[in-house]
UniProtKB/Swiss-Prot annotation:
It comes from Cutibacterium acnes (strain DSM 16379 / KPA171202). The gene is rpsC. InterPro entries: KH_dom, KH_dom-like_a/b, KH_dom_type_2, KH_sf_prok-type, Ribosomal_S3_C_sf, Ribosomal_uS3_bac-typ, Ribosomal_uS3_C, Ribosomal_uS3_CS. SUPFAM superfamilies: Prokaryotic type KH domain (KH-domain type II), Ribosomal protein S3 C-terminal domain. CDD domains: KH-II_30S_S3. This is Small ribosomal subunit protein uS3.
């Protein structure tokens, strides 16, 4: 079951929250359709901004939209001109007052949706699919991910018969509900047809209440230091001392440290 279902829906209420937060009775179907139109318009017109997720909140006639983007400057524009244009277009689309909250994704290398979109853009630019997957895999692991799984499906490399290929590194426990697994999907439009890209990223186990989970998420983002990278100890080394040189060199260094230095007499004394 965990292998087939969407990881976000499978863990809804356990480690993930709803991306749309409002309540309605008679207007439920109308508001759901309105949310779909908002998301489609944003994904179509702000594709270059690298949208990770869109969250929508409603209060009476006011709609609050949270945009998580890898490049928020594209959404904001010069002196906020682009953000005002987007807000105006959405108000025309919905006929309601719109409030935009634009947030930056601190570590795009460990965001599954952005990783999938990056691979798809490389495939559309005729980059070899294996090279694109390996590069994304290494970047995610170097940025602090505990495990990653990437799968590409379609006419890979322009082959006549479609197939699926994937790479995996680390742990990706899809059946564990407490596991914080991010999932993303994007389609690459190539001359041979569309290629689907799926990405699963494991960031660790999550426990406690929603408030505690939010605090843990903020702590992980602060520990990654923005965009992550290979600073500090390399992955897999931890705090272990450098073992290069072998046991003999270590024993010789220890013996020389324990041997007292010879005392020399002053010739002029």
């Amino acid at each position: 079951m965990g292998q087939k279902i969407n990881p976000h829906g499978f863990r809804l209420g356990v480690t993930t929250d709803h991306k749309t937060r409002w309540y309605a009775e008679k207007q439920y179907a109308e508001l759901v359709g309105e949310d779909v139109k908002i998301r489609e318009w944003l994904h179509k017109n702000l594709e270059r901004a690298g949208l990770s997720s869109i969250e929508i909140e409603r209060r009476s006639e006011r709609v609050t939209i949270f945009l998580y983007a890898a490049r928020p400057g594209i959404v904001i524009g010069r002196n906020g001109a682009e953000a005002e244009r987007v807000r105006g277009e959405l108000e025309k689309l919905t006929g309601k007052q719109i409030q935009l909250n634009i947030l930056e994704v601190k570590s795009p290398e460990t965001d599954a949706q952005l990783v999938a979109q990056g691979i798809a853009e490389q495939l559309a630019a005729r980059v070899a699919f294996r090279r694109a997957m390996r590069k994304a895999q290494q970047s995610a692991m170097n940025a602090g991910a505990l495990g990653i799984r990437i799968k590409c499906s379609g006419r890979l490399g322009g082959a006549e018969m479609s197939r699926s290929e994937g790479y995996r590194e680390g742990r990706v426990p899809l059946h564990t509900l407490r596991a914080d697994i991010d999932y993303g999907f994007f389609e690459a439009r190539t001359t041979f047809g569309r290629i689907g890209v799926k990405v699963w990223i494991y960031k660790g186990d999550v426990t406690g209440t929603r408030a505690e989970r939010a605090a843990q998420k903020a702590a992980r983002q602060a520990a990654q230091g923005g965009r992550g990278g290979r600073g500090g100890n390399r992955r897999g080394r931890g705090d272990r001392p450098d073992r290069r040189g072998g046991r003999r060199r270590a024993e010789a260094a220890k013996q020389s440290a324990e041997t007292p230095a010879p005392q020399t007499e002053n010739a002029g004394a």
